[in-house]
Amino acid sequence: MEPLHARYPFLARSREAVEAAAVDLGEIVATDETVTARALERVESAITDGTVGEPHRRTRVELLSYPVARVLVSLVDVHICTRKYAQAEAEAAYDRFTEEFATTTELKSTQRETLDRTELLGEFDLASAVSDAGDGYRVEVGAYLDLAADQRGDSWRLVNRPLTDGEVRVTAEELNVLLKQAIRHRVTDGLPFTVPDAIADELTAEVEQLEEVLSELELTREIDTVVPELFPPCMKSLLDQVQKGEHLEHHSRFAIATFLVGIGMTTDEIVDLFQVNPGFGEEATRYQVDHIRGDTSPTEYSTPACSTMQSYGDCVNMDDLCEAISHPMGYYEQKLDDTDEEELVDWREDEGEEEADA
């Protein structure tokens, strides 16, 4: 196990180093608290601040913490956790390889083994898809589309890129960003996976700690986008009932109200939405929403999980994504992630434009 393996644990040769050492993962989680603690730190830091924490000074601990972290992510089995973890690992690798790429040849000869761009391209079968273009690089359009699909901003759209003979011109920095995306794909690949009971039992405390972090964290703090067509089926149904003026049971009103608060709607906006409902009372509705938000109570309430929605009969019209998601907010976040930013039209903006036209 070499330092480079620990810095880039997703590499094939890093995985081979672990296999060559005949490491028993079950024994590791049962007896090596240092590795388990570092694995927990990787995942918890990814959730809370988008990093993988500080690397451990011992190469063995740092490297083995990676597969254990993947086990923890699989046991938690929440989309937001998986996404944040993969992104954090990719960001950490990006910071390391961009620094190493920038290191001069002279310095490399006297320092530790480093990763170069050629090896990283080969790792993801991109060596034949990327060629030097003097002041930048050319990337085959298929590879480019795959790696640029999740990038934000017009500059990444194929229509805005120089395209010649099926190849897209990119700068060195842009190629590094595409490589970061390839790493994120590699980390995400296979997650979550089935974990043997013997290993899962040893990690019960760590999984509970991560679940507590997830429950306390305001995972939707960055969401301020209201796109009803991307709502989970349960919330679409409840919103439809509200807009049709149908009566909602208390638990149903609570569910849709917490969801709307969670995605960034203000109290006034939610009150306006509920005005068509026969059970509407502005003062009571405003109080309930402010109470949910934590303005009039010591507790900020979150949207019920799918299991709770099912128990109250509010879970309807399940689709394929529902099968893989355990929380309505996770469903909505994934839908937002999967939709091109230019296609996201906030419902509140539409309402404002209609009022202006009127």
From Swiss-Prot:
<keyword id="KW-0639">Primosome</keyword>
<keyword id="KW-0411">Iron-sulfur</keyword>
<keyword id="KW-0235">DNA replication</keyword>
<comment type="subunit">
    <text>Heterodimer of a small subunit (PriS) and a large subunit (PriL).</text>
</comment>
<feature type="binding site">
    <location>
        <position position="234"/>
    </location>
    <ligand>
        <name>[4Fe-4S] cluster</name>
    </ligand>
</feature>
<dbReference type="GO" id="GO:0006269">
    <property type="term" value="P:DNA replication, synthesis of primer"/>
</dbReference>
<dbReference type="GO" id="GO:0003899">
    <property type="term" value="F:DNA-directed RNA polymerase activity"/>
</dbReference>
<dbReference type="Pfam" id="PF04104">
    <property type="entry name" value="DNA_primase_lrg"/>
</dbReference>
<dbReference type="GO" id="GO:0006270">
    <property type="term" value="P:DNA replication initiation"/>
</dbReference>
<dbReference type="InterPro" id="IPR023642">
    <property type="entry name" value="DNA_primase_lsu_PriL"/>
</dbReference>
<comment type="similarity">
    <text>Belongs to the eukaryotic-type primase large subunit family.</text>
</comment>
<keyword id="KW-0408">Iron</keyword>
<protein>
    <recommendedName>
        <fullName>DNA primase large subunit PriL</fullName>
    </recommendedName>
</protein>
<feature type="region of interest" description="Disordered">
    <location>
        <begin position="335"/>
        <end position="358"/>
    </location>
</feature>
<feature type="binding site">
    <location>
        <position position="306"/>
    </location>
    <ligand>
        <name>[4Fe-4S] cluster</name>
    </ligand>
</feature>
<keyword id="KW-0004">4Fe-4S</keyword>
<dbReference type="InterPro" id="IPR007238">
    <property type="entry name" value="DNA_primase_lsu_euk/arc"/>
</dbReference>
<dbReference type="GO" id="GO:0051539">
    <property type="term" value="F:4 iron, 4 sulfur cluster binding"/>
</dbReference>
<keyword id="KW-0479">Metal-binding</keyword>
<feature type="binding site">
    <location>
        <position position="315"/>
    </location>
    <ligand>
        <name>[4Fe-4S] cluster</name>
    </ligand>
</feature>
<dbReference type="GO" id="GO:0046872">
    <property type="term" value="F:metal ion binding"/>
</dbReference>
<dbReference type="GO" id="GO:1990077">
    <property type="term" value="C:primosome complex"/>
</dbReference>
<feature type="binding site">
    <location>
        <position position="322"/>
    </location>
    <ligand>
        <name>[4Fe-4S] cluster</name>
    </ligand>
</feature>
<comment type="function">
    <text>Regulatory subunit of DNA primase, an RNA polymerase that catalyzes the synthesis of short RNA molecules used as primers for DNA polymerase during DNA replication. Stabilizes and modulates the activity of the small subunit, increasing the rate of DNA synthesis, and conferring RNA synthesis capability. The DNA polymerase activity may enable DNA primase to also catalyze primer extension after primer synthesis. May also play a role in DNA repair.</text>
</comment>
<feature type="compositionally biased region" description="Acidic residues">
    <location>
        <begin position="338"/>
        <end position="358"/>
    </location>
</feature>
